């Protein structure tokens, strides 16, 4: 009754978390609480457990419980009952209770129950650890690693237990690359020197055959514990360096560390492998109470070393010590008995296996079969084989080897045929399920293996298996293989055609998808809604209005035009092709208004007419159709202009009023995009701060991109740093965004750090990311880094890559390199574009290659048919003017018949200033001021011309005009990285802490310039350099 009182809802004493947690250890406690009469496997254990619990002797209770068979099965039954009871009583399953329930199901290996409970939780690191531990224990390493990545994506900070679980998985799978990434994360979190995490790292590197790395990690651990030492010398053992392992063990003992049980067992095993059986026995004798693992090592080790009699002796000594044998113990001693062919001892061990309930174990059964076979007792072996209901390939092989050993070849073939025919009952439904699993996990290798078995079993012509194979290969990225399977299929149904057409649409190969769709109809296969939807999606991708209309006609013919799914796809196709009128017609023809079809039409209106979209939204509310998150996200995205910010804010209010959360990634990014695109940066930042953590990578990237697009580059970089501090791993879109920010800020140090992170995260560099890196390095002045990224690109078929490198060389003064890259580009048959020629002409201008510049300009127009833009002409004017061809530059401007543009006169004005052509310069400056009266550079250059002529009155008058017009000189800025610190300089600003040293250095430079006649001494003395 006491326990029943604890379960009443009114009782304040009920600690649901502690209770559920204990179920993993004491299911009998739960059985007594609920009063269920659940028969125990061993009534004595049950009674002992009840007595210990009644006396609150929990330690003894646990010891008794650990000896009870089938305790996990009992724990699961009781756990489900307690979980059900907590739901009935209305107990909140969040927090510690929820974690405890997940932990219970995880420890009982109930994957589906654990995942369902986990999905309902507000997850913390404890829940994640339970799931990771479960996936690890049931042998699903892929799940472990993917869940670990999801943990980071959900911005949950892992703890030492998390790292330990994932590192152990990496160790088992020898996935050293993923392990290194985890190592980097641990370094960032400052956990690599922790003995717990350090030990896991040592173990991972050791098991991945990176013993040198394991040793380096070990030496970094502040205070290595016994586990760390054990992992290290275990690593040396695995690496085939047993002598070094023994040295580590001896050093461990010399430094005062008491080896734990695992250490003893590992070193004993090492001694045995080295053939030092005497040392192994001496060390084994030092163990106060060796457990079954230690005994197994001695039995197995001596048996493998040819000391079968000693191994058998250790087995019987173990029995005298009251240590219970395991299947490994029995397997090892049976192997030794088989070698000595001592049937009497074999019978004793067989009796022991029956007594322990292990005779039905497949491993023990295989050992028994092997032992009897070697004792030439195949009848006894056959009895063991037949007695076992569940057989695996090991068991079958043991019998085959037994008959072979005894020369019964006909029995071998008979058993082999039985094994193939009835041993494994795998049919087409089984293979379909297996292939579906491969498709979902994108496991092409496993799928290919199943395909081989299917071929051998002649199931490849089965329609269901064929469809599953096409789907598996397509989803695993092997579309050509999927097509081959498709072409070889004798029978095809709608599922077959839908699968292959949808695969090509997904691969963005719309032309092939259209061809297959036509072929399908020619074969007389009636299209269904799924097939039409896939084909219409292809039409949408290429804006194929003609093909879309054909599909529309076919849908009418098939009677599917009024189908909701097909109708929505038609609306989407017409909208994205810009035919909103036809989209509205399709919408009106549908039998009822649904949120799906309305969303499609609202999306169409949003792209073409925001006002119509708002009207349709209001009509939607009037008709009683409740908008969804997609509805709001679609219409909010359309409010991307400053004038529509008010409307967007009103929709934001509607979202909140209707109970929709901005936490959702799709809706959240839509709102943030709306605010930032309409320059509502304050509102965007406020919304972002309100979103709960962990925030997704999409939201972080959106904030960076929005700030960058609005010119807030430093703020964008701050968001990136905050994101990294929160433990969120960037993706390719994030890298591209933040690298562009580094380009604008000329932040080479940050750019290099991001490049390094891309490398360490093992991201494949696509063309976009590579081009952005090339541009970043170039704009930061590091052409070596830019060239290296370019050289490492797998494919350089995109003109953007070449343009980035050419312009980088040109702007950094490496004209010869720019021209060489231009020649290489043409030799690689890459067609140059306008940007290419602009970069090459810039290079010619900086290097004074007037003749080459003229030829390239003519090549652009004559050979490649590219019309000269103002930028190209301005570049040519700069080239001619910079090197003294002022008259030709002036004539060149007049010959182009272009609309007057400030860039042309600005280039000519700069050239006149350099070569002292004051008359032409004055004319150019006046034309420039006429075109751009607010451009301060024109006034400054003209003022310098007046100053050089000594016309101070004109210069002062010009400055007065600047003041009257409100024209202010825009200060120039520069960023310089020195010793990992970015220094920002602005023209006219003397607030830098080292300004004194800077001015002294500038004076020295001025003196050198005067001595070399680089500048006119009179100009320097008059201080007119300050105006430039």
UniProtKB/Swiss-Prot annotation:
The gene is PCMP-E88. GO terms for cellular component: mitochondrion. GO terms for molecular function: RNA binding. Belongs to the PPR family. PCMP-E subfamily. It is found in: Mitochondrion. Keywords: Mitochondrion, Repeat, Transit peptide. Residues 904-979 are annotated as: Type E motif. This is Pentatricopeptide repeat-containing protein At3g09040, mitochondrial. Residues 980-1010 are annotated as: Type E(+) motif. It holds the Pfam family E_motif. It comes from Arabidopsis thaliana (Mouse-ear cress). Residues 1-30 form a transit peptide.
